[in-house]
Amino acid sequence: MIELLDKVRPSSSCLHVLFISYDGYTTNVPIEAVFSKQSLLATSLDGEPLPTKYGGPVRVVIPHLYAWKSAKYIKEIHFTDHLHLGYWEKRGYSNTADPWREERFIDKEVPGWRD
């Protein structure tokens, strides 16, 4: 991911990164998440192009956030200065998604989610 950021050079006003998948799935992460050395854009597996069943052609992997932030089938990446809620975030899931802080939902309990 660092190689991409070196080429793109997001502006200093960039606060968020929005990933858009071929299947319409979207997720947004804070810019700090993509600057993490743990984060990566996977394009291959064992020297071969990443198979669709594993999220190819491009999959973002951000292991220090909840799994819904690691989108598959990436077709677009937007660097933005404002928050765009992704698929799960529009449904009440946390935008920051830190599992160590148990940031699963925007509110600790989302009304109706157990129904």
Predicted regions span which residues?
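Structured, non-membrane catalytic/scaffold regions adjacent to prosthetic-group chemistry
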Residues: 1-115
